[in-house]
Amino acid sequence: IKHRYPKRYQPKDENGSVKHIARIDDIHLSEGQWLIMAQAGYILNPVAETLKSLGLLYTHKGHRSISARISSAVNGWEQLRKGRSITLEAARDVYSYMSTGTRVKRGFKKLSGLDSDVLLDMTFLQEQCGLLVGDELIWHKALDRLPEEQRVYITALLRRGEKFNAEPRITVSTIHGAKGGEADNVVLFTDLSPAADEAFRVGNDDVHRVFYVAVTRAKQNLYIIEPEDNNRSYYI
């Protein structure tokens, strides 16, 4: 880097690690806090699909891989099946993924006319709020309007033991978007976009700065993914 401020660096007391990995599938992601980064956003789109196929909960572009509404609906229905009460908001989330006529009587979907702080159980919903089904149906049968892709993903999460309504342990972000954040474990893709590669070839220091930010996000372990094209990547 041509123009930089001198800095003094001090090591931490504990050991860390830096590993070069062929593919993200080769990393054990089922425990701990993770930050997965790349220089360009499009590089991360296949990563999100891989995490879904592995049954892992994550945040990407500031959004959970399972929306709060879907989490509320699935969790709400299972709470009702256990004989517990849920909030009006959760009940509305449940109803929003049920078909009119087979799951909920017509005219009851919005659950109008109830106090906002009311707690509702299965019996009340059946007797007073048009619910046509009961605890004989598990969530993926009761919530018949849930998109199939989400149904498969939630099933994969549950099989892996992930708590789909918890705060995600894994964040997927561009390096720029992760500035200021950090994690015990960082996974870094070194591929460059065409624009970044061109800037790098003419001696632009910005690419150095970007990857300096990336590697310094790791608190314990840094995993460097081998690039698809060595001629268009940042070597670490």
What feature does the model see in each segment?
Residues 1-236:
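The feature marks helicase ATPase cores and/or their adjacent C-terminal helical subdomains
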